[in-house]
A protein has these predicted regions:
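Beta-rich accessory regions
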Residues: 1-166
Length: 166
């Protein structure tokens, strides 16, 4: 497994920032860092530390800089102490939250640190968070497209990013 290079990053406005590289990344506001295409079988692993209790972040798959639609696993705050993974269709032609596509609620880590492991096998994607949440869904086209780590609000630090692909 190796740390990927950042292929592109958001440059929306002065409040949305991407700082650092893939080994030590900081996303602020509504920002994203795009990474190269994935293989057919992948293991993505990283740690996210949020600055506040309500900061929101996620991972998008089947994404490119010009994608009209892509799919995101969003770690959404359901309250100050609870989180849930929402499955969303994002992009200029996306419809947002996909009903009945979310996870069970889990407790926000006391230290705001989320250890994330994502495995994909062709179109099956499974996301694990801190050994307390597991979410699986089918997403077509993972292996032909880029992916990103996103901040939707607040400030998130990403460390220890590795990707292993077959």
């Amino acid at each position: 497994a190796a740390a990927p290079t950042i292929a592109a990053k958001s440059e929306n406005n002065a409040n949305d920032k991407v700082e650092g590289d893939a080994s030590n990344l900081k996303l602020t506001g509504n920002a994203w860092a795009l990474f190269p295409r994935l293989g057919y079988q992948n293991r993505i692993e990283f740690t996210v530390k949020t600055a506040g209790k309500r900061d929101k972040f996620g991972v998008s798959l089947v994404r490119g800089t010009d994608a009209d639609v892509f799919y995101s696993l969003v770690v959404n705050d359901e309250g100050e102490e609870t989180r849930k993974i929402n499955f969303e269709q994002q992009g200029t032609a996306g419809i947002g939250f996909l009903a009945n596509g979310d996870s069970y609620v889990f407790q926000r880590p006391a230290d705001n640190t989320y250890h994330i492991v994502i495995t994909t096998d062709n179109s099956i994607c499974t996301m694990y968070i801190n050994d307390v949440c597991c979410y699986t869904n089918r997403i077509y086209g993972i292996q032909r497209n880029c992916w990103s780590i996103n901040s939707y609000s607040g400030s998130v630090e990403v460390t220890g990013l590795t990707v292993a692909s077959k």
